[in-house]
UniProtKB/Swiss-Prot annotation:
Keywords: Glycoprotein, Membrane, Repeat, Transmembrane, Transmembrane helix, Transport. It comes from Laccaria bicolor (strain S238N-H82 / ATCC MYA-4686) (Bicoloured deceiver). A motif (NPA 1) lies at residues 111-113. Gene3D superfamilies: Glycerol uptake facilitator protein. GO terms for molecular function: glycerol channel activity; water channel activity. Induction: Highly expressed 15 degrees Celsius. The expression is comparable or even higher below 15 degrees Celsius, but transcript abundances decline at elevated temperatures. It catalyses: H2O(in) = H2O(out); glycerol(in) = glycerol(out); NH4(+)(in) = NH4(+)(out). Residues 72-89, 150-183, 235-267 are extracellular. This is Aquaporin Lacbi1:391485. Water channel required to facilitate the transport of water across membranes. In addition to water, also shows strong glycerol and ammonium transport activities. May be involved in fungal nitrogen (ammonium) support of the plant host in symbiosis. Glycerol accumulation has never been observed in ectomycorrhizal (ECM) fungi, therefore, glycerol permeability of Lacbi1:391485 might be a relict of the affiliation of the protein to the group of aquaglyceroporins, and other osmotic active compounds (e.g. trehalose or mannitol) may have taken over glycerol function in ECM fungi. It is a multi-pass membrane protein. Glycans are attached at N183. Residues 1-50, 111-128, 205-213, 289-312 are cytoplasmic.
Length: 312
């Protein structure tokens, strides 16, 4: 049986600088460094890129949440500054900009669920995973902290004082499901949205499918996140990214909201915005690999590949 897997199929998770249209620098960063700083920073560039990418994602996304919701209070603004579409645009732009910044350096994961799926199914080095996830989580905390400082006075007005913090404004930073949703329904919603996310990401990176032209991956992600928010976002706030929820949630716990942000619905935070995206990304990847992917790193494509059937 002939091998139908081509060498030019996408070999792993990391999108190369060439895929983003970057030109090589005048010197090779991997072998020659013009000064000590360039040499010292090299081992950390990928992790810093993930940190900054997630921080930018949160600044745009949580910033949009804060501006739209807080401005609805007449004590903050004379008229509302946006609507649900504004929220979705904020998250879509944040995702696109975060990937634009980090894509040519780290691959632009900016999502622990994506990182883990790429490790399991695309050959992403396992030893990089803890550092990537830590950087992503830290980026979520720092990004949320910057937005909190920016909007602290408006939050004070809405809450009624500096030392009053409730889930009403905690929901600007992390996701809290609608009251009518059961935890099982919330889990399914996050699972489904993340599975859709990862399937499109794999299709976008699959050279045997229909990848976007060089440099346009962030634009595809913009429409992807905008679409997920418009279709699946109302009930849970579509975390679809553990770092997007857990990082800001930890920030709120540190700035005065306390344990209530973790006690909501008996540890809702761990099942729906964390575990569900991780599982959704795994199942979405399995689905894509089973039915579409033809790259050499497709685990299902290698099963039984050593068996050759001779014609009768």
């Amino acid at each position: 049986m002939d091998d139908k897997f081509d060498d030019d199929a996408l070999p792993n998770s990391k999108t190369t600088p060439e895929d983003y249209g970057d030109k090589l620098a005048e010197y090779d960063y991997t072998n020659t460094f013009p000064n000590t700083w360039m040499r010292l920073r090299e081992p950390f560039r990928e992790y810093i890129a993930e940190f900054v990418g997630v921080a930018v994602l949160i600044i745009f996304g949580v910033g949009a949440d804060c501006q739209v919701v807080l401005s609805a209070n007449t004590g903050v603004a004379p008229s509302p500054k946006g609507d649900y579409l504004s929220l979705n645009c904020g998250w879509a732009i944040g995702t696109a900009m975060g990937v634009w910044i980090s894509g040519g350096i780290s691959g632009g994961h900016i999502n622990p669920a994506v990182t883990l799926a790429l490790m399991a199914w695309r050959g992403f080095p396992w030893w990089k995973v803890p550092g990537f996830i830590f950087a992503q989580l830290l980026g979520g905390i720092v990004g949320a902290g910057l937005v909190y400082v920016n909007y602290i006075h408006a939050i004070d007005i809405v809450e009624g004082g500096r030392h009053i913090r409730t889930l009403d404004t905690a929901g600007l930073f992390a996701t809290y499901a609608a009251d009518y949703m059961t935890n099982v329904s919330c889990f399914f919603s996050e699972f489904l949205a993340t599975a859709v996310l990862i399937v499109v990401i794999h299709a976008m990176n699959d050279k045997r499918n229909a990848p976007p032209p060089a440099g346009l991956a962030p634009l595809v992600l913009f429409f992807l996140i905008l679409g997920i928010g418009a279709s699946l976002g109302m009930e849970t706030g579509y975390a679809i990214n553990p770092a997007r929820d857990l990082g800001p949630r930890m920030l709120t716990a540190m700035v005065g909201y306390g344990r209530q942000v973790f006690a909501f619905r008996n540890q809702y935070w761990i099942w729906c915005p964390v575990i569900a995206p991780f599982l959704g990304a795994q199942v979405g990847t399995i689905f894509y690999d089973l039915f579409f992917y033809k790259g050499q790193d497709n685990v299902f494509g290698r099963l039984g590949s050593h068996i050759h059937i001779s014609p009768a």
